[in-house]
Amino acid sequence: MIHELPKLPYALNALEPYISERTLEFHYGKHHQAYVTNLNKLITGTEYENSSLEDIIRKAGGGIFNNGAQVWNHTFYWNCMKPKRGGEPTGKLADILVKNFGSFAEFKEKFSTAAATLFGSGWAWLVKKSDGSLVITQESNAGNPLKTGDHPILTCDVWEHAYYLDKQNLRPGYIADFWNLLDWDAIAGRL
């Protein structure tokens, strides 16, 4: 199976002023594409040659896992955002966040802290556990909750390439801007 760079669900400049077109040109067009290219090279002639990204994440290790997970993680991340979104969730998602975290404000603070305090590169995730509870996790590097059987709901990419052109070393500023882009309808659809 040849993996391809999926089309972004919006134009490269659509997330401005929060994420610049220049950042997306590099983040999506260079970094995400490189993970796809590297994955295809690595799986050729292996047991993973015809595997889905999900199977690669659950079963592979090393470079195949790293590149496969990064392809999946980035696609998931792009689909967490939409131009002119943000605000707060409503309905079932809002109720579940209150049940699990006390309030939306508490959830937002805990998720932001997890994203800001992750040492080095990686991802902050909101995941649904097998018992139905929602938890916030930190995954270093290419970490992905599918590997441990969790169900991803939301992610924030905290690799420096996600924000360095716009925010330099100010990761918390990038995280604050991230909240202005969240597509709560898409996120709620993952419950």
Predicted regions: what is each one?
Residues 1-191:
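Feature for soluble, non-membrane regions of globular proteins
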